[in-house]
Amino acid sequence: MQQQQAWAAGLGGLAVAGVGEEGGGGGPAPTTVDEASMERSKSFVKALQELKNLRPQLYSASEYCEKSYLHSEQKQMVLDNLKDYAVRALVNAVDHLGTVAYKLTDLYEQQASEVSTLELKVACLNQQVLTCQTYTDKEGIRQQQMTGTATRHHKHYIVPTLANKRMQAFSEMQTDADIDSRPRPYPSAKTLFWHLASEKNSKTNGARQSEFVLEETKATKPASRGKEPSTSPLPKHLQTNLASSDFAMHNVGMKDQPGVRHLSSFSSFDNPRGRQIQKAPLRTKSMLAAFFVKHKSGKMKNVSVR
């Protein structure tokens, strides 16, 4: 009976040790970050120490089981108690290992977070130091410069210089010359003034030409009427033919004179490249009649010769 009580007391102590490890986190909650990290570190150290204490406990339990088995008469009951104790000891050891691993992972994550925070703070400090150093270098260079600092103003307007004006005018003139020298596939455009002037000139030339022809016909008719009869024995129809041919030659001679020029033959002053407008010569009834009479007189002459 005493052996069973001792055996139960040993198993109870081992179980209480495991439960104490699991519920060892009870206590006042930490208020700051430093206190929380300290509590995590303490719990990890405590779990690791309890895991280390399992070894001597297991050794002492094994020695006690061996002595009990040798000196006890109920060996079967000792073996059953030993199996139960071994299972509980194994479960408790695994529980201690899990607790230690969890505590270690938590502590590692906390340390990694603290390290990343410190790295961020160090990077911010380095950036601030670099900014201060750059500003210090610029300020030192500015103070070491011998020349005075000139005030800078924003340019609202850009005034071209004289050379730029000359170059711009020369480029515009060259562009205009290139455009004028290019061949155009269509005729050049006429202005309204050019059309009005050409229309006025054509009307004036037509009126003058008609007046000139009428005056010539009037002048030739009285001359032919007042002309003395020739002494040659020409027939009357031959004399009429001769008068009409003289009149036609006179008109042709007047038109072919180099001094007589029409206004329509000159090009316009507004557009020197424009086409020259020339009007066809007017043919009066007397000229046509002269040609017809000439043919008739030729036929009659041939008949008279026969």
Swiss-Prot record:
Localization (cell): Cytoplasm, Cytoskeleton
The entry's keywords: Cytoplasm, Cytoskeleton
Spans annotated as Disordered: 200-236
Main location: cytoplasm
Cellular component terms per the entry's GO annotation: cytoplasm; cytoskeleton
InterPro entries xref list: ABI
The protein's role, per its UniProt record: Involved in regulation of actin and microtubule organization. Part of a WAVE complex that activates the Arp2/3 complex.
Similarity remark: Belongs to the ABI family.
Self-association and partners: Binds SCAR.
Protein name (record): Probable protein ABIL1
Organism: Oryza sativa subsp. japonica (Rice)
